[in-house]
Design a protein with these regions (language model features):
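Carbohydrate-active catalytic/glycan-binding domains of CAZyme proteins
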Residues: 1-302, 308, 312, 317, ...
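Extracellular carbohydrate recognition and processing domains
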Residues: 225-227, 316-344
Length: 344
């Protein structure tokens, strides 16, 4: 099973978590057709209770609300810690023009989130991932061919420097790590290159402790037609299924206007993950047999931010994908043009 998730939004780097029986995706946002990753300035959250109907909760954090950052709001993650929801994200620091890992807080899993500032003790804090088990929290991050992990201090404002581990030599990771647990093993999934050649493939390594050491296990998302060059994602169990979320260029054909993907994965008895077979590319517009709804009734208007945008499979007469962008002030409504092409 492989599906495109919410094809009306261009987004990437999905981090999946289940809170109170609902699946949430925390994603970076691709500004459509800008032909650069430098234009990424905000994050969205999406959620579902059935893997079919998705709610886009809208913008959960924007660059304009992060005083220390200037650009490059790339990959993120989120998790629940001591009754609050925390977002770990990365951006270029205004003082150094290098990546730092930021921390933001919310009372709700769908946000919006409020920036708390950078996490101390993290060098080149690109692509942070946030793992919680019991009374311990971990930060995993990576970029420029390195992946590192450390235990958070209790307030999440810094990491315990004595716990920092560089995992790069053992697993040959490139960036974008994510940690999940299956049975008694910890699975670190991450993008990797084959002899420094692009595109990236999704690899994984396992350990008996979150801090490692990790053993490389192989590739479970190989190169496929319609990839976006990069691949970044997560793995989660939901309603009895193990699911991999990642991004591709299946809808736009562009590496900078990416689409969210969902594939079911299977584990063998020895714990290995069966490689996915993604051999079908969808050219141009895709038929999703659903109506895309911008549901203003559940979307409080706040300074141009639209929250609670709903994607629903309530109809079978819509066969395209679109997006609404560029809202800068509070409005009562949005007009959307729909064009229907007849057979022949």
């Amino acid at each position: 099973m492989t599906n495109i998730v919410a094809p009306s939004i261009f987004a990437a780097d999905p981090a999946a978590h289940v809170f109170d029986g609902r699946l949430y995706l925390y994603v970076s946002y691709d500004e459509p057709f800008t032909n650069t990753h430098d234009s990424m300035v905000c994050y969205h959250a999406l959620s579902t209770d059935d893997l079919v109907n998705w709610i886009d909760h809208g913008r959960i954090l924007h660059l304009e609300n992060v005083s220390w950052a200037i650009s490059h709001m790339w990959a993120i993650d989120a998790n629940k810690w001591k009754g609050k929801y925390y977002l770990t994200f990365c951006a270029f620091d205004e003082k150094t023009s290098t990546f730092r890992t930021g921390l933001a807080i919310s009372d709700r899993p769908e946000g919006p989130f409020t920036d708390l500032g950078p996490v101390e003790g993290v060098d080149w804090g690109q692509d942070p991932s946030f793992y919680v088990e019991g009374d311990r929290a971990y930060l995993i991050w990576g970029g420029r061919g390195q992946i590192l992990i450390a235990e958070f201090n209790d307030d999440l404002r810094s990491v315990k420097r004595e716990t920092i581990r560089n995992l790069s030599e053992d697993i040959a990771g490139y960036e974008g790590p994510f940690l999940h647990k299956y049975r008694d093993d910890y699975y670190l999934t991450y993008p990797a290159l084959d002899n420094e050649k692009w595109p990236q493939r999704m690899s994984y390594a396992t350990a008996r402790d979150p801090l490692g050491p990790y053993t490389y296990r192989g590739i479970f998302i190989p190169e496929y037609e319609g990839n976006s060059g990069t691949i970044h994602g997560s793995v989660v169990e939901f309603q009895g299924k193990w699911l991999a979320f990642y991004h591709s260029a299946w809808v736009s054909g562009l590496a900078t206007s990416r689409s969210l993907m969902m594939s079911e994965i299977t584990y063998a008895e020895d714990g290995s993950i069966a490689p996915l077979k993604l051999d079908k590319k969808i050219d141009g517009a895709i038929t999703i047999n659903s109506r895309q709804i911008l549901d203003v009734s559940v979307a409080p208007k706040a300074g141009g931010h639209l929250f609670g945008v709903q994607v629903s499979t309530s109809g079978s007469d819509f066969t395209g994908a679109g997006f609404v962008t560029g809202l800068t002030r509070q409005e009562f409504g949005v007009s959307v043009l729909s064009q229907i092409g007849l057979p022949g």
